[in-house]
């Protein structure tokens, strides 16, 4: 058994309710066309080459949930290649519905833990990264499983271009305190809270944001820039 808190093996559910016929069909037929194969330890990937039309820049979303945010970003920015990482099959299926309905050609998916993909990407290859409403892992003994973690931030700092943006949002008070503390302490990121409550203009909404508001938990929205090399 591993003792490494940042071991990339997934902790949590991979599947929820049984998929409907359309969703299962998209998993069977569309996902294989969009999926990024898991790289080996020594593999290196050119993210620009993953797309049929070379994008102006590449953005990454880690844990895209139901895919509302990722699909909206991809639709609004057709010149950008958007990579989404998600392990939950039902969330992947929801995103595939958006991709199919919007005929998005600039989306690629990694249906595994993002930490298995990131080491294979080259330095300064991402313009933006999004971590929207991640699993808060509220128990203290599980805090090392949180994606926003010093070691993961080291990796993201390597991947982001100078002044590249990392957006993180959460409605969990414990996670908010954690992410603000960890990000503020990291020497290669500069930024902070953009809004506590209302979603910033131009940031697409998600089902998790809507649920947070319904349940009386105002989200905190943060933006961080990669300090120049």
What are these regions, as identified by a protein language model?
Residues 148-162:
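A short glycine-rich, Lys/Arg-flanked "PGG" loop and its adjoining helix->strand segment in the class I
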Residues 119-128, 133:
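A short acidic, Gly/Pro-enriched loop at the edge of an enzyme's catalytic core
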Residues 1-60, 68-75:
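S-adenosyl-L-methionine
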Residues 162-170:
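Conserved beta-strand signature within the Rossmann-like core of class I S-adenosyl-L-methionine
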Residues 139-147:
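Glycine/threonine-rich flexible loop motifs
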Residues 175-177, 181-229:
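Class I S-adenosyl-L-methionine
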Residues 129, 156-157, 166, 179:
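Class I S-adenosylmethionine-dependent transferase superfamily signal
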Residues 57-116:
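SAM cofactor-binding core of SAM-dependent methyltransferases
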């Amino acid at each position: 058994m591993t003792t490494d808190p940042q071991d990339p093996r997934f902790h949590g559910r991979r599947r929820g309710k049984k998929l409907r016929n359309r969703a299962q069909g998209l998993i069977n037929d569309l996902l294989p066309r969009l999926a990024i194969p898991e790289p080996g330890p020594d593999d290196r990937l050119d993210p620009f080459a993953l797309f049929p039309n070379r994008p102006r820049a590449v953005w990454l979303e880690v844990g895209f949930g139901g895919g509302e945010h990722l699909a909206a970003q991809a639709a609004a920015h057709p010149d950008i290649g958007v990579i989404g990482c998600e392990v939950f099959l039902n969330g992947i299926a929801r995103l595939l519905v958006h991709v199919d309905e919007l005929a998005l050609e600039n989306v690629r998916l990694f249906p595994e833990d993002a930490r298995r993909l990131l080491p294979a990407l080259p330095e300064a290859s991402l313009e933006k990264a999004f971590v929207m409403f991640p699993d808060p892992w509220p128990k203290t003994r599980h805090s090392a499983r949180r994606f926003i973690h010093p070691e993961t931030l080291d990796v993201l700092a390597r991947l982001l271009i100078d002044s590249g943006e990392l957006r993180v949002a959460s409605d969990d008070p414990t996670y908010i305190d954690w992410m603000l503390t960890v990000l503020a302490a990291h020497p290669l990121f500069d930024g902070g809270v953009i809004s506590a409550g209302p979603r910033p203009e131009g940031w697409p909404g998600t089902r998790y944001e809507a649920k947070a508001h319904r349940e009386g938990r105002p989200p905190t929205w943060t933006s961080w820039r990669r300090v120049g090399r």
